[in-house]
Amino acid sequence: MVENEMIKCTEAFEVYWKKYAVGNLYITENDEYIFKYNLENVEKAKKEGFSYIIGFKNINEEYKSEKLFPFFSSRIPSKNRHNIQTILRDLNLEEYNETLLLKITKGKLFTDRYEVR
């Protein structure tokens, strides 16, 4: 379990834009998702063109959801893909798990400079 700033988490990820850890995604014991920006790193990243992550426009807000935020869920293979079983087998996963998929794939897309670690 990870404890960060009074948030009891089962998982914690840093969200990178280029080389900057601009935010954190936490998954709590109660399966709640929390996203918060790292304000110090956001200020550094702004000097290189960063503005905000889609769906998280207010950099001072703490975002909470009972489901994985669309920004993150769109970065992993969909549970409904026709070849999802092949993908899971190739990744050595027995079943579909958003958290493990995010961890394994690092949420990388060819279309942007974000990475989830």
Residue ranges and their predicted role:
Residues 1-117:
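Phosphate/dinucleotide-binding and metal-coordinating scaffold of catalytic cores
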